[in-house]
């Protein structure tokens, strides 16, 4: 149990049996009336963002979320199998929990899995990953100066936009949050 005065960004709260991450908060002390805390909360499972105001000093439940480094092993039907790198326990995580991270997951890649009471909540990948281009159209000779882009398929099957000079077989850096091309990988 904590009070609204103890809130910090990134904290996970248990409100009415649902888990919410504190995205931002602001303690407000108006000239007239009691102080209050204005927060922006993000639902852990759905990603829905809401604004919620608490009176200052109100008790809130803080959920314990355990973030563990795990290794992605393989995909089995509708779930992804991860192994805890410390205990070697295997977790079958549903595809909807993995979400967009599935587009950038390679076998044996490490990711951070957030667990609440043994239940996986979400999967966090590093900000950027290096992946190989498996297919892209060759760049047209006259198009190089325009700075245009073309679609490319990654080894995970995901499609991204890359500059015209990138060819099949090259390793590129991709932002896992936006799916954007960041540059060639340093090999």
From Swiss-Prot:
GO molecular-function terms, A-Z: translation elongation factor activity
SUPFAM superfamilies: Nucleic acid-binding proteins, Translation proteins SH3-like domain
Protein name stated in the entry: Elongation factor P
Organism: Acidothermus cellulolyticus (strain ATCC 43068 / DSM 8971 / 11B)
Domain of life of the native organism: Bacteria
Annotated metabolic or biological route of this protein: Protein biosynthesis; polypeptide chain elongation
InterPro entries: Elong-fact-P_C (IPR015365), NA-bd_OB-fold (IPR012340), Rib_uL2_dom2 (IPR014722), Transl_elong_fac_P/YeiP (IPR020599), Transl_elong_KOW-like (IPR013185), Transl_elong_P/YeiP_cen (IPR001059), Transl_elong_P/YeiP_CS (IPR013852), Transl_elongation_fac_P (IPR011768)
Family classification: Belongs to the elongation factor P family.
Family annotation (Pfam families): EFP, EFP_N, Elong-fact-P_C
Keyword annotations of the record: Cytoplasm, Elongation factor, Protein biosynthesis
Gene name, Swiss-Prot/TrEMBL: efp
BP terms from Gene Ontology: peptide biosynthetic process
Gene Ontology CC terms, in alphabetical order: cytoplasm
Compartments in which it is found: Cytoplasm
SMART domains to which the protein is assigned, alphabetical: EFP, Elong-fact-P_C
UniProt key word Phosphoprotein: no
Function: Involved in peptide bond synthesis. Stimulates efficient translation and peptide-bond synthesis on native or reconstituted 70S ribosomes in vitro. Probably functions indirectly by altering the affinity of the ribosome for aminoacyl-tRNA, thus increasing their reactivity as acceptors for peptidyl transferase.
């Amino acid at each position: 149990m904590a009070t609204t005065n103890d809130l910090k960004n990134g904290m996970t709260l248990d409100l009415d049996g649902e888990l919410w991450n504190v995205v931002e908060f602001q303690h407000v002390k108006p000239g007239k009336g009691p102080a209050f805390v204005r927060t922006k909360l993000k639902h852990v499972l759905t990603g829905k963002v809401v604004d919620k105001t608490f009176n200052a000093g109100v008790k809130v439940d803080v959920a314990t979320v355990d973030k563990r480094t795990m290794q992605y092993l393989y995909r089995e039907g509708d779930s992804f199998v991860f192994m805890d790198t410390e205990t070697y326990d295997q977790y079958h995580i549903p595809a909807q929990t993995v979400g967009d991270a599935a587009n950038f997951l390679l076998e044996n890649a490490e990711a951070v899995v957030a667990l609440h009471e043994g239940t996986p909540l979400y999967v966090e990948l590093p900000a950027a990953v290096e992946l190989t281009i498996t297919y892209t159209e060759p760049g047209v000779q006259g198009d190089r100066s325009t700075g245009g882009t073309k679609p490319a398929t990654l080894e995970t099957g995901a499609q991204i936009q890359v500059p015209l000079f990138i060819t099949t077989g090259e390793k590129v850096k991709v932002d896992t949050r936006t799916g954007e091309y960041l540059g060639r990988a340093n090999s």
